[in-house]
Amino acid sequence: MNTELDMQNFEHIKFLENQISEDHFRWKKNSKHLYNLLITRTLTWPSLSIQWLSAMESITEKAVLKNRLLLGTHAAEGMPNFLQLADLDLPDFNQTILDPVKHYNEDTGELGGYSMQHSCKFQISQRILHNGDVNRVRHMPQNPNIIATMSSCGNAYIFDRTKYTSMPAEEFLPNISLIGHKKEGFGLSWNRQQNCRLVTAANDSKILEWDLNNFSRDTRCLTPVKDFHYDDSPVNDVEYHPHHTNLYIAVNDNGIAFICDNRLQQTCSKTVKASNPLFSVRHNPSIATLFALGSEQDLQLWDLRNLNKSVFNTSEDLSDNRLKVPSRLTLGGTSLSWSWRHSGRIVSACQEYCYVWNFNKANPLEFVHAGHKGTVNEVDFDPFEAQCIASVADDNELHIWKPNVIVN
């Protein structure tokens, strides 16, 4: 046992914890100047995943936008897990005059909504009992009532939320169980061009495609229509191309991103090799050839027309000191989300921080969100409100935030 090495590791961990506490204190002190909107809520259990629903209602007379969010739970051992639907009322920024933060609660340590006329309302409106942790949750683009999850038990599940009451039942009963993976996973993506089609990826190194049209009510189970296996490395993420029925990209622990076409006998048509394990992939919704890859060390942009060299890489741009950021920050991207309103803007999350990038600028780093005290599990851009972002972390917190100050 190397006592000296253990002590060095302990001191390094304590240093990082103190640094995070100092960063969070400064963030809380300055938050009133940094955001047009900031909502923080402490959840009962951490959520590993978050997604805005693609349906929103505008209440014009109240200047309110009624949104919904999908969340999960990562409960303690022996405690039940739930798929959760949350209602969120936000101010309509086109009708409301915004004011700096006035609603910080000293007792709870929570920040509320920041408009002059409205407080933002958040509540869990529906909970559905789930088998295992909700590793990932996504709704069908063509029908937001149909929800898919990836579970820590290895299976994927489909729920029609209209078939469940607001309070959870005592028995776990999904509408469909997707049977095929042998280990847990986090890769999950619906096909935006083909109704009822989705793809999953897991630690068993498999990528499976599913067609819900093949579902039989007699068994309530479904087997995959396609099975792809590249190597023995865990596949961490997968996403269909938003404008193409047959294309998707997946990434794995070996740092390989494989571009796949399910019409081909050899499904993988091209690959990109990174120097670190890859955890996230996202296609740009506006630029058909552009996609982003994220690892714990860097964020990379690639163009499908030229896979010989990345368009942008944070580790390379840091080496020439073009990005003016503290050296302790790791500009990786274990979770990524492109803006639906601005083609050059993406948010990445790594460790306790979220980074907003605008690649239409010479210095692309626009904003750093330092409000979380635990590792950020997932980030998601609001599809309706430009620059509004949701993030969830291991500190049990959900943050809804819209930056006010853009740092150049």
Curated annotation (Swiss-Prot):
One of its GO terms (cellular component) is cytosol. The keyword Nucleus applies. It is found in: Cytoplasm; Nucleus. Keywords: Chaperone, Chromatin regulator, Cytoplasm, DNA damage, DNA repair, DNA replication, Nucleus, Repeat, WD repeat. WD repeats lie at residues 129-169, 180-220, 230-269, 273-312, 330-369, 371-408. The keyword Transit peptide does not apply. InterPro entries: Histone-bd_RBBP4-like_N, WD40/YVTN_repeat-like_dom_sf, WD40_repeat_dom_sf, WD40_rpt, WD_repeat_RBAP46/RBAP48/MSI1. GO terms for biological process: DNA repair; DNA repair-dependent chromatin remodeling; DNA replication-dependent chromatin assembly; mitotic recombination-dependent replication fork processing. One of its GO terms (molecular function) is H3-H4 histone complex chaperone activity. Pfam families: CAF1C_H4-bd, WD40. It comes from Schizosaccharomyces pombe (strain 972 / ATCC 24843). This is Histone-binding protein pcf3. It comes from the Eukaryota. Transmembrane segments: none annotated. Disruption phenotype: Viable. Component of chromatin assembly factor 1 (CAF-1), composed of pcf1, pcf2 and pcf3. Interacts with pcn1/PCNA during S-phase. Interacts with swi6 at the G1/S-phase transition and early S-phase, but not in the G2 phase. The CAF-1 complex interacts with histone H3-H4 dimers. Acts as a component of the histone chaperone complex chromatin assembly factor 1 (CAF-1), which assembles histone octamers onto DNA during replication and repair. CAF-1 performs the first step of the nucleosome assembly process, bringing newly synthesized histones H3 and H4 to replicating DNA; histones H2A/H2B can bind to this chromatin precursor subsequent to DNA replication to complete the histone octamer. Plays a role in the maintenance of heterochromatin. Belongs to the WD repeat RBAP46/RBAP48/MSI1 family.
